[in-house]
Amino acid sequence: MAKFDAHLKCSFCGKSQEQVRKLIAGPGVYICDECIDLCNEILDEELIDSQGGSRQGAEPSRKAGAAQARKSTKPAPTLASIPKPQDIKAFLDQQVVGQEAAKKVMSVAVYNHYKRLAWQGDGKGETEETATRLHKSNILLIGPTGCGKTLLAQTLAEMLDVPFAVADATTLTEAGYVGEDVENILLRLLQKADMDVDLAQRGIIYIDEIDKIARKSENPSITRDVSGEGVQQALLKMLEGTVANVPPQGGRKHPYQDCIQIDTSQILFICGGAFVGLDDVVQKRMGRNAIGFMPTEGRGRGKATRDLQAAQVLRHLEPDDLVRYGLIPEFIGRMPVSAVLEPLDEHALESILTEPRDALVKQFRTLLSMDNVQLEFEPSAIEAIAQEAHRRKTGARALRGIVEELMLDLMYELPSRKDASSFTITRAMVEEHTGGKVLPLPGSERQQESA
């Protein structure tokens, strides 16, 4: 057999197999070693040119980025700059209606947390007093949907002027499974801080729906619970305080990237959840049936009554009850501060509509004032909106949906009306679920006749 086949040639330079050292075959094509070397040289030259240009262009941007980072980095809190618990609660009162016990608990916990940060970074010499290490106390909020758990955490971050990130525990899974890694929570906080690590390390993270990662039974299971107990295990070190490696582009879609290190020991974690059925666990532990907490005439009423009774039962909550519910003891130990939020009654919903700084009534008044229309709500209309929201049983979240539905026709018609300078919402409009049906529109009869 011949050593070389004269019919085989390089598809690029045309040299035969005899004229080159190596001829590599592909699907219907051939390439010689000389062409491969030439291709490598071309690629190397283009790579060097592109890197040189990027370096020249990136140098000023890097300097600008460093300057921006220095500009955005805020100094560490000092003892004098931290608001006192009473001041914190007074600020919460402006935004959150009710929940007095929860606001008091959170005010003290947040004050102690940032006082701890100031104590560690005050620059004093090492003494017997300053050598004492202060450990942080994360917060667990328990309450029905729409009672103000997220708003409490968000208002605290607004007052302290620190980055605030919200995460959903239901999307978290263990590493290696479909879903989000726990490190993505830190990435959201870092993004809120404009990638300023020092600022992010003084921020607040709120993890919602934390009750959804409770394991299905109190006893350990032989099957893998990747979104329940597994997530609790993954969150332990982050809650306690560790130096976590955070991929700036997300870890699963971009595995090959430099990670940013964040120390979580200074981040305040607030976890919230509805914990449906937890009151039954407490009653079972205390050995009392429903009669012990609810009179006979109170049983059989609506969901609002049951939620109120559940909040009263949860005042006797102990850590062992959370273990029976499905949280592992190690996780509970890292959430030493807990607060139970009560369901909102009709009176509280009326206050939410009018009293807070960003109340819904004030928001819609501002919107219509831009169209030179003065909007008013009759007290009976406010009462009717609160009653409807209470009937829907979704807390304060129902208020916006009701008002949006009520204001749809008005906000469609009034901006085009030149003769409308004021408008009043009545109870009848609320009960009919629209303001447009009772709004007299000039020319509407002529439009109907022409139609």
UniProtKB/Swiss-Prot annotation:
GO molecular function, a single term: unfolded protein binding
Domain of life of the native organism: Bacteria
GO cellular component: HslUV protease complex
Binding, ATP: 144-151
Binding site for Zn(2+): 10, 13, 32, 35
Pfam families in UniProt: AAA_2 (PF07724), ClpB_D2-small (PF10431), zf-C4_ClpX (PF06689)
Record has Zinc as a keyword: yes
ClpX-type ZB domain residues: 1-51
Keywords: ATP-binding, Chaperone, Metal-binding, Nucleotide-binding, Zinc
CDD domains for this protein: RecA-like_ClpX
Record region (Disordered): 50-80
Protein family per UniProt: Belongs to the ClpX chaperone family.
Complex formation: Component of the ClpX-ClpP complex. Forms a hexameric ring that, in the presence of ATP, binds to fourteen ClpP subunits assembled into a disk-like structure with a central cavity, resembling the structure of eukaryotic proteasomes.
Function: ATP-dependent specificity component of the Clp protease. It directs the protease to specific substrates. Can perform chaperone functions in the absence of ClpP.
Protein name (Swiss-Prot/TrEMBL): ATP-dependent Clp protease ATP-binding subunit ClpX
Gene: clpX
